[in-house]
A protein has these predicted regions:
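Conserved substrate/cofactor phosphate-moiety recognition/catalytic segment
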Residues: 24-70, 88-89
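A glycine- and Lys/Arg-enriched "phosphate-lid" helix/loop adjacent to the NTP-binding pocket
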Residues: 88-158
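Conserved lysine of the Walker
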Residues: 15
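A basic- and aromatic-enriched beta-loop-alpha substructure that forms the phosphate/nucleotide-
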Residues: 62-102, 125
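NTP-dependent small-molecule kinase module
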Residues: 135-196
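P-loop (Walker A) phosphate-binding loop of NTP-binding proteins
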Residues: 10
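Post-Walker A alpha-helix
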Residues: 18-19
């Protein structure tokens, strides 16, 4: 079973861009969110009754990706992932009343069931950026966004709460507020951490 690295942070911080930059080194097998391909994402953006279906789809999709990455010949690298989808996005959607309390509980039960059979990532790379940077990056994205720039502070509070339960040696905080989009500095930090 191969190692797995999850890159986490709020929407717009640069998770997918960093994963793509790291993939160019040839050292990683990668998995991306694939917003456009997810069958309920656009529906959820238009109608909140698709929120539960969207979350269940993402949980299953991310679990499938983790299994594939664990079986790959290279270190696995995923943007976001199962844990971020539950601990942050599901809680955010509940706080915005896009999911009911029973729907949130169903998501928790499904997450716990899936995670019981899949080991957690060995390393979580948390991308940190000021809210202005996140808002600017989010505004230039050409994809479906359910999380909004104004959600960043609340999202980060959920992220901090979750990461407080993870052993500190498994979390690498990387400030990308002033990082260029080639992520040269961040790539070096991460490659050194995983000894590549």
């Amino acid at each position: 079973m191969n190692r797995l690295i999850s890159v986490v942070g709020p929407s717009g911080v640069g998770k997918t861009t960093l994963v793509r930059a790291l993939a160019q080194t040839g050292n990683f097998a990668t998995a991306l969110e694939q917003h456009a391909e997810r069958p309920f994402q656009a529906l959820f953006k238009q109608d909140q009754r698709y929120g539960l279906a969207n979350q269940i789809d993402y949980f299953l999709f991310r679990a499938e990706q983790e299994k594939e990455l664990r079986a790959a010949s290279k270190i696995g690298l995923i943007d976001g992932g199962l844990d971020l989808d539950f601990h942050c996005f599901t809680r955010l959607f509940r706080s915005r009343n896009l999911l009911s309390e029973p729907e949130h509980d169903l998501c928790r039960r499904l997450y716990d069931f899936i995670r019981a059979d899949l080991p957690r990532p060995e390393l979580i790379v948390r991308l940190v950026a000021d809210e202005g940077t996140v808002a600017a990056r989010l505004s230039t994205r050409d994809r479906i966004n359910i999380a909004r720039a104004e959600d960043t502070a609340l999202f980060n509070s959920f992220l901090e709460e979750w990461l407080a339960s993870v052993p500190s040696g498994q979390v690498l905080n990387v400030d990308v507020s002033h990082e260029r989009l080639d992520y040269k500095v961040s790539k070096r930090i991460i490659l050194e951490r995983v000894s590549i």
